[in-house]
Amino acid sequence: MKMAVLVRTDLDMGKGKIAAQVAHAAVSLVLEIVQKRSKAEWKEWLEMWINQGQPKIVLKVKNLDELLEKYNKALQSGLPATIIQDAGKTQIEPGTITCAGIGPGPEEMIDNITGDLKLL
């Protein structure tokens, strides 16, 4: 089990901004599974992921198009996925999509979507 967060590298975000956006993605994924009517399978994956130490990986995407392509593939594969839009209070324009979160889910399923991406 793992979670992947994909971060756009075409935006001029500082390290702190990136860290905050990655945290937003991770928290949003968990909240979506816990608070909404999500698939029973997702709840099982969440529990397994928590018991395995909550492994996460942060990866680079070149731009919005690549981010949305990976996000849509995750949804089509049956994985939990979320998009993070910035509030625009500091470095980025309001509503800018900064990152996407995928998972938690089976490592193989996530790797099939993100295996070509580099670590941030």
Curated annotation (Swiss-Prot):
Keyword terms: Cytoplasm, Hydrolase
GO terms, biological process: translation
Catalytic activity from the UniProt record: an N-acyl-L-alpha-aminoacyl-tRNA + H2O = an N-acyl-L-amino acid + a tRNA + H(+)
GO terms assigned for molecular function: peptidyl-tRNA hydrolase activity
Pfam families in UniProt: PTH2
The organism's taxonomic lineage, starting at the top: Archaea, Thermoproteota, Thermoprotei, Sulfolobales, Sulfolobaceae
Localization: Cytoplasm
Protein's recorded name: Peptidyl-tRNA hydrolase
